[in-house]
Design a protein with these regions (language model features):
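Short, positively charged and aromatic/hydrophobic N-terminal segments
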Residues: 1-6, 13-20
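Proline-rich intrinsically disordered, low-complexity coils
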Residues: 2-8, 24, 42
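Structured catalytic core of nucleotide-sugar glycosyltransferases
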Residues: 13, 22-146
Length: 146
């Protein structure tokens, strides 16, 4: 019996060795579930990269971006691949079909290597600037920040 395309589920298509830790030894993982985000993903990446650069300076932290393509029908996966080729901090996971946002978040959390892990939607409904405040709140002693 031939393999179905569903055997790809949960398989990461890139190498995780590029993830490093900054001067403070802190790695921040940003898990981004994506479904048909071809228009918003480049904008999200641009905005999140700005914040990552600021936090690398302010906190001495390194970032990894984990884009989880949840079986998109548009160019979301191709865009994630392009971002990975241009930026070693970018990783991606591709599902063979749509399994839902929760499955995407779970796969991203399992793949995350960071000391801190945040999830954020690619549609920019959440303020990307909140990342800095969230890390500060966590470092102030909170167990969970949202």
């Amino acid at each position: 019996m031939p393999k179905t395309v569903e055997t790809r589920v949960g398989v990461c298509y890139n190498d995780f060795k590029y993830c490093t830790k900054g001067e403070t030894g802190m790695l921040i993982s940003l898990v981004v579930p994506c479904y048909n985000e071809e228009e918003s993903l480049p904008i999200f990446y641009k905005e999140a990269s700005k914040i990552a650069q600021q936090m690398e300076i302010s906190h001495g932290a390194d970032f990894e971006f984990i884009f989880v393509d949840d079986g998109s029908k548009d160019r979301t996966l191709q865009i994630a691949r392009e971002l990975h080729r241009k930026d070693a901090r970018v990783r991606y996971i591709s599902f063979s079909r749509n399994f839902g946002k929760e499955a995407g978040i779970y796969a991203g959390l399992k793949a995350a290597k960071g000391d801190y892990v945040a999830t954020m939607d690619a549609d920019l409904q959440d303020d990307v600037d909140a990342m800095d405040r969230m890390i500060d709140a966590y470092e102030a002693g909170n167990d969970i920040v949202y």
